[in-house]
Amino acid sequence: MFCIQCEQTIRTPAGNGCSYSQGMCGKLAATSDLQDLLIYMLQGVSVYAVKAREQGIIDAEIDSFVPKAFFSTLTNVNFDDERIMAYAQQAAHYRAQLKASYEAACEQAGIAVEQVPQVAQLVLGTSKIEMLAQAPIALLNKDKHDVHEDIMGLRLLCLYGLKGAAAYMEHARVLGQTDADVAGRFHEIMSFLGEPSVDGDKLFTTAMDIGQLNYRIMAMLDAGETQAFGHPEPTVVNTKSVKGKAILVSGHDMKDLELILEQTVGKGINVFTHGEMLPALAYPAFKKYPHLVGNYGSAWQNQQQEFANFPGAVVMTSNCIIDPNVGSYSDRIFTRSIVGWPGVVHIEGDDFSAVIDKALALEGFIYDEIPHTITIGFARNALMAAAPAVVENVKSGAIKHFFLVGGCDGDKADRSYFTELAKSTPKDSLILTLGCGKYKFNKLEFGDINGIPRLLDVGQCNDAYSAIQLAIALAEVFECDINELPLSLVLSWFEQKAIVVLLTLLSLGVKNIRTGPTPPAFLTANLAKILEEKFGLRNTTTVEADLKTMLNVA
């Protein structure tokens, strides 16, 4: 086992990364090894997808499968060995299918079949024992003694960034958004990473290419969400419990939320969002469901307590899931899509009757809590609608600075930095937030500036796209570069989606971003120095010191 993809990975003087019997996330060594083998098989599929494309062969089914299966290897997504093995076996089937199509096309065209790298040649074992025996070939640091640590760090930066992009591709696909060119570029990068490179410049360029690719993917996801559900609008949301039977929907998949809402109409069940599903409450399409009553709980890391206290059924539509046995709710939590946990019921297809039956059998909330509301829904359209008023307030001096504070949440004590930063921002500044990092401060009162709320909840982590659009619009109005705006970006990172959002921002030329609370363990000190020199990227320090720098206070 070797896994170093998230913030909670083991860090010791002897080396970083989880490499024992179990990772800090709860992932067993066997699961980690099977995930590495799955990635290896997917890279082999991409090798042949690239070759097939050269002969004009595009398989949309395979284009959709590879990022979806890759998504299953993200932090806190799928812990079910049987499901991971099934993905690997499906990958082997698709690779053989593409290989046959490619070779037939070459024969018909009268050209030689090109040799493929080792990553596209492995004959996958048929049992768990056989697959685990093959896993060392796919170990991410298998050649760590032969290559420089900076090269290893760049490889992992690319791999983990592409994982984040794969997740967004799958979210977009669920909403009907696919693009053959995007899929083609994705396969090219997967294929490249399947042949471990020692070219630092090429790896760095690839990291920026992944950022650019993800910008296109985020635009696709934005289109999918707004076409399906309308543009988010400022919305007041209750964050307290409501009396009645209950279902809690966590993750990111709004299509699943829609299906659950449709299937619970008239059944006397209240539906609550959780975590990154909170932004769904701002979409017009969901406002026609009066039994979508609010948001319950906070960010992913608190789920073992929050789900244990929730008196209904819980559905995990995507990341992040953690051990449901700790809170003794494994019999009433259900997984969807790429999510998996051994022993937990997995919902295939679009029938949520098992979830509904479980909710009806449980007690539900026995009384209404006193409501506490927050305002959400400041995504792209709402931000653009507010832009003229924002510009006027900037020109008048009422608004002097913008902060984007968001990203992933986590349970480290030093994440209180983000709470204190938000509380310490000047009263003449606006705070944009997104991702589950918002839960560090989104229930606090920040007031407004001439009717414009100081705290603007942009949405899910992928809605960084909305924030980018606002920054571009403001830069055009003020006839300046984005980096010349009075804008400071402070991103909390935990896993691979945050990595690819960061790569997207860097690839767009956005500079002087702060990330925290701790730097990724796979980034060497030298790589961190290069990123700081090239982009001004730096780690958070103290709220007082960082604010002085961001506000140019001597």
Swiss-Prot record:
Belongs to the HCP family. GO terms for cellular component: cytoplasm. Hybrid [4Fe-2O-2S] cluster binds at H252, E276, C320, C408, C436, C461, E495, K497. Its EC number is 1.7.99.1. InterPro entries: HCP/CODH, Hydroxylam_reduct, Prismane-like_a/b-sand, Prismane-like_sf, Prismane_a-bundle. The gene is hcp. The keyword Oxidoreductase applies. Pfam families: Prismane. It catalyses: A + NH4(+) + H2O = hydroxylamine + AH2 + H(+). It is found in: Cytoplasm. The modification Cysteine persulfide is found at C408. Catalyzes the reduction of hydroxylamine to form NH(3) and H(2)O. Keywords: 2Fe-2S, Cytoplasm, Iron, Iron-sulfur, Metal-binding, Oxidoreductase. This is Hydroxylamine reductase. Its cofactor is [2Fe-2S] cluster; hybrid [4Fe-2O-2S] cluster. GO terms for biological process: response to hydrogen peroxide. [2Fe-2S] cluster binds at C3, C6, C18, C25. The keyword Cytoplasm applies. SUPFAM superfamilies: Prismane protein-like (SSF56821). PANTHER family: HYDROXYLAMINE REDUCTASE (PTHR30109:SF0). Binds 1 [2Fe-2S] cluster. Binds 1 hybrid [4Fe-2O-2S] cluster. GO terms for molecular function: 2 iron, 2 sulfur cluster binding; hydroxylamine reductase activity; metal ion binding; peroxidase activity.
